[in-house]
Swiss-Prot record:
N-terminal region as annotated region, ranges: 46-65
Protein name: Cytolysin tenebrosin-B
Molecular functions (GO terms): channel activity; toxin activity
GO terms under biological process: cytolysis in another organism; monoatomic cation transport; pore complex assembly
Organism: Actinia tenebrosa (Australian red waratah sea anemone)
Role played: Pore-forming protein that forms cations-selective hydrophilic pores of around 1 nm and causes cardiac stimulation and cytolysis. Pore formation is a multi-step process that involves specific recognition of membrane sphingomyelin (but neither cholesterol nor phosphatidylcholine) using aromatic rich region and adjacent phosphocholine (POC) binding site, firm binding to the membrane (mainly driven by hydrophobic interactions) accompanied by the transfer of the N-terminal region to the lipid-water interface and finally pore formation after oligomerization of monomers.
PANTHER family linked: BRYOPORIN (PTHR40388:SF1)
SUPFAM superfamilies: Cytolysin/lectin
Amino acid sequence: MNRLIIVFIVVTMICAATALSTKRRINKEEKDEKRSVAVAGAVIEGATLTFNVLQTVLKALGDISRKIAVGIDNESGMTWTAMNTYFRSGTSDIVLPYEVPHGKALLYNGQKDRGPVATGVVGVLAYAMSDGNTLAVLFSIPFDYNLYSNWWNVKVYKGHRRADQRMYEELYYNLSPFRGDNGWHNRDLGYGLTSRGFMNSSGQSILEIHVTKA
């Protein structure tokens, strides 16, 4: 009888431990799923990158006059590894998603400097691609729309190169940036890649880019 009681207790403890482990795993999966839906800093399925997702990322920043949500879909056949973001003005509390495999999309955001300051959010982000080159993306949301407009750009640089002031100047002034005009624009990036991107004209902007094999 005592042996039966001991066996019963052991089985009960094993079942309870298994149930607890399963519950924790399910909770973790639910949290990961929620995070992958529309959170800046997340990597999501490329096919799910939409305007609605970016609007959710943008809304999470709160009531800020100059802000941007960025989504970049990797259909290049390569893996991207984050290098850095260079801000000409503005900032972000989000770390660039470190690794973006083929078929996935990264979500990122930026905002004007905090406080009553007359700045926009302008910067460049850089990703090292597994072929040894660099994907660079420019976003520019000005403070004063009497003088400036929204602009964006995308380029593949040969070799690995971090984002900096020089890269910003090249992409903004010299390499035919696209105006944020509420329309789609296509570009041959070279190296067997092409891009399709959209930016709106608002001070609370979204930038959606798809990088695919040519």
